[in-house]
């Protein structure tokens, strides 16, 4: 099978959309020999911070010498990013080989899998073929009925920051959403949690008590920021000092989740030296999370798509770029709470550019532009995200800041454009 045929297979199931439930992915994996049963996992659910926390843990485990798989979604620039081993995305030939194994199994199924289920199965097969010692596995949506929850008890189950998102599927209270996320907790694992609201903590404590598993919660008071600039942060947690290239105070809490997860893994026999923890955190890369892509003018990229993320971006703009003129390049999905997202960011905006993310669920730039008019600031409508980035750069002064925000489905196109522009200008 060629990579084009593999992509056609994946696209062919894409139109079926998202259908919660484990029966299809369970059947598909069983038909290929249940590769997930031969692997060890750190399973991560939550509303925000899943990807950043997963990237930190994968970097630490790799630095400790383990062959480390990483499964995340969605991708930014290329599909292969969704499954990586030791920081390297799956090669085309190996993705094609995994899909070739899956194809006859899919054809034999009465109830055919969704795109996410197919990709989850392909990843499990590839991680097994690559001999992964451990896989950091990010939930796609929710937890209880997510395809990744087909695994048995993981070495550690991690719950990152829980907020209101996907309410039409997961429920419209924090407690309901927390119950869905807590569906990844199983007897025989250990649980680690971000510092949550009282409502969420109550659900996690009740679930862990019922399952008879230990729960470690990050102690937010034990996090001490020591240095903070656009070049990265230094902080201490429980007295030990760490460097972190990711920006924003929330990333210190995500890092503390990673540190508590390392401690939990150590109790289960995983050998993770302190030096590997320091090296992993210092080297971690996780694009499109308040990522500074260029300076003079500054261009910051954030894929955040809900009000919680917007508050984080607003805090970071105030912290890193006080007093500067900021243009917000915004693109959103129509089913997201974009009025609240924009309301959080508007105090920092001198002007807006409206773009259309690369998704069938996108709100058209024209509609977004019309909505933005109410804030009484200049609004430019430029549907193509790359052209919107070019337009923003053309209008910006040396000291100005452009902040692209609202959707990971827009962030990838902008990141690709800026990388190519940088390569052309530097003669690469």
Locate the predicted segments by residue:
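Nucleotide phosphate-binding/pyrophosphate-handling subdomain across enzymes
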Residues: 38, 134-137, 145-158, 162-163, ...
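N-terminal leader/targeting and accessory segments in enzymes
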Residues: 1-48, 52-67, 76-78, 190-193, ...
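Short, high-confidence coil segments that cap the C-terminus of an alpha-helix
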Residues: 131-133, 323, 397-399
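Beta-strand->loop->alpha-helix junctions that form or flank phosphate-binding loops
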Residues: 194-195, 207-229, 245-249, 277-283, ...
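Active-site-proximal loop/hinge segments that shape catalytic or ion-binding/gating pockets
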Residues: 407
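Acidic, Mg2+-coordinating active-site environments of NTP-dependent enzymes
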Residues: 111, 118, 131-138, 154-238, ...
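ATP-dependent carboxylate-amine ligase catalytic core
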Residues: 18, 22, 26-37, 63-152, ...
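C-terminal helical cap/extension that packs against the catalytic core
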Residues: 194-216, 230-231, 298-299, 307, ...
């Amino acid at each position: 099978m060629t990579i084009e045929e593999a992509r056609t297979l994946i696209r062919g199931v894409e139109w079926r959309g998202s259908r919660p439930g484990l029966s299809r992915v369970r059947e598909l994996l069983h038909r290929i020999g249940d590769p997930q049963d031969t692997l060890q996992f750190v399973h991560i659910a939550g509303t925000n911070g899943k990807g950043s926390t997963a990237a930190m843990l994968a970097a630490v485990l790799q630095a400790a010498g383990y062959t480390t798989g990483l499964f995340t979604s969605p991708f930014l620039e290329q599909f292969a990013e969704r499954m990586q081993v030791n920081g390297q995305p799956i090669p085309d030939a190996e993705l094609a080989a995994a899909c070739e194994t899956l194809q006859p199994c899919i054809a034999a199924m009465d109830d055919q899998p969704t795109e996410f289920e197919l990709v989850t199965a392909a990843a499990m097969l590839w991680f097994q073929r690559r001999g992964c010692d451990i896989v950091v596995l990010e939930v796609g949506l929710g937890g209880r009925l997510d395809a990744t929850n087909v695994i048995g008890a993981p070495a550690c189950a991690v719950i990152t920051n829980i907020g209101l998102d996907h309410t039409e599927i997961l429920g419209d209270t924090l407690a309901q959403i927390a119950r869905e996320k807590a569906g990844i907790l199983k007897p025989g694992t250990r649980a680690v949690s971000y510092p949550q609201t009282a409502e969420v903590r109550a659900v996690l404590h009740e679930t862990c008590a019922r399952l008879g598993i230990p729960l470690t919660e990050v102690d937010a008071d034990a996090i001490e920021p020591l240095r903070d600039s656009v070049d990265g942060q230094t902080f201490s947690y429980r007295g030990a000092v760490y460097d972190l290239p990711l920006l924003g105070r929330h990333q210190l809490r995500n890092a503390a989740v990673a540190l508590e997860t390392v401690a939990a893994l150590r109790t289960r026999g995983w050998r993770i030296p302190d030096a590997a923890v320091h090296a992993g955190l210092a080297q971690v890369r996780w694009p499109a999370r308040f990522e500074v892509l260029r300076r003079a003018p500054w261009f910051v990229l954030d894929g955040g798509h809900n009000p919680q993320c917007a508050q984080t971006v607003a805090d970071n703009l105030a912290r890193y770029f006080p007093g500067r003129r900021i243009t917000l390049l915004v693109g959103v999905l129509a089913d997201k709470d974009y009025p609240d997202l924009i309301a959080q960011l508007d105090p920092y905006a001198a002007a807006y550019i409206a773009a259309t993310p690369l998704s069938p669920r996108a709100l058209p730039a024209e509609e977004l532009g019309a909505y933005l008019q109410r804030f009484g600031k200049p609004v430019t409508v430029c549907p193509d995200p790359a052209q919107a980035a070019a337009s923003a750069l053309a209008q910006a002064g040396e000291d100005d800041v452009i902040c692209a925000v609202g959707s990971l489905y827009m962030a990838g196109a902008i990141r690709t454009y800026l990388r190519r522009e940088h390569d052309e200008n530097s003669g690469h």
